[in-house]
């Protein structure tokens, strides 16, 4: 028998009580600090009179607080109606499903609610897509805010509509899985409210191939031209993006649908497109296939 002194059993109840007291004291101190900050803001010496950093307790709460202003308001200019409340529903979905499935389901729900409230399909998809991406990134990254630029409904050469999503440089922070699932969510949402699929033209396909040849930033995987052509042709959503690099395209400089909101051509390399296709759709294709097969 060992002569070492006997180790006393831990008093679990006491430890639980001490932990609860510690968390309660943290909450009390936070309330005090926020009260002081609110009084300071009321002086009108800062840019805004409200505290910019809201409190959030979990993923559902963080997602709502992150996107509430302006993306959950039916009319962000008028603010005559309260924003959509998604916290409780998202929390319920996260209890029943994995995070990726919950992201898709809450994105569909937000899109339908926003479309019913506004009748604006573009805004409905925009709000739903950002909510889905926020859930995928734990609502702690800038990707849902700055990683997506314009979400637009544009026209194919035959006049039919399609969805175009502008991906920007900060989408890199989301990682390949969230980038690829962002495209999948966009496809699901455009189907939900009756927007057609993207039918790329030869110049639009060749433009992406040219950009990969010019892109000099780090990529985990740079697809060859043949693979790029397959992805662009088969993707039902247009992976678009803002110009991020200094290099200008030469062969396919001015291409229909690769334009800014005001109609001017985007002639330089679009880094967000490279990231989403290279690190997202190419590297995470098996994961996307798993979700598409499960969702039929």
Residue ranges and their predicted role:
Residues 1-296:
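Extended, Lys/Arg-rich, non-catalytic nucleic-acid recognition/anchoring regions
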């Amino acid at each position: 028998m060992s002569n070492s002194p006997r180790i006393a059993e831990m008093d679990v109840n006491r430890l639980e009580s001490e932990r609860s007291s510690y968390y309660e004291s943290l909450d009390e101190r936070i309330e005090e600090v926020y009260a002081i900050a609110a009084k300071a803001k009321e002086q009108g010496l800062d840019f805004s009179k409200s505290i910019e950093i809201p409190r959030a307790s979990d993923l559902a709460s963080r997602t709502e607080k992150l996107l509430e202003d302006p993306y959950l308001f039916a009319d962000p200019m008028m603010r005559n109606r309260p924003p959509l409340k998604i916290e409780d529903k998202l929390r319920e979905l996260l209890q029943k499903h994995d995070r990726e499935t919950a992201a898709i389901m809450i994105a569909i729900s937000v899109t339908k609610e926003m479309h019913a409230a506004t009748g604006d399909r573009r805004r409905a998809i925009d709000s739903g897509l950002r909510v889905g991406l926020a859930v995928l990134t734990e609502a702690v990254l800038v990707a849902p805010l700055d990683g997506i630029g314009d979400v637009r409904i544009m026209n194919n050469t035959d006049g039919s509509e399609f969805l175009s999503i502008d991906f920007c440089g900060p989408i890199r922070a989301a990682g390949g899985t969230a980038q690829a699932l962002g495209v999948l969510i966009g496809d699901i949402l455009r189907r939900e409210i009756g927007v057609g699929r993207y039918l790329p033209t030869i110049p639009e396909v060749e433009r992406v191939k040219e950009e990969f040849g010019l892109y000099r930033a780090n990529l985990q995987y740079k697809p060859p031209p043949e693979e790029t052509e397959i992805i662009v042709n088969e993707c039902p959503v247009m992976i678009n993006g803002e110009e991020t690099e200094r290099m200008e395209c030469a062969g396919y400089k001015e291409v229909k649908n690769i334009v800014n909101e005001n109609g001017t051509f985007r002639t330089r390399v679009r880094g967000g497109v490279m990231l989403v296709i290279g690190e997202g759709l190419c590297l995470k294709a098996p994961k996307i296939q798993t979700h598409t097969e499960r969702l039929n």
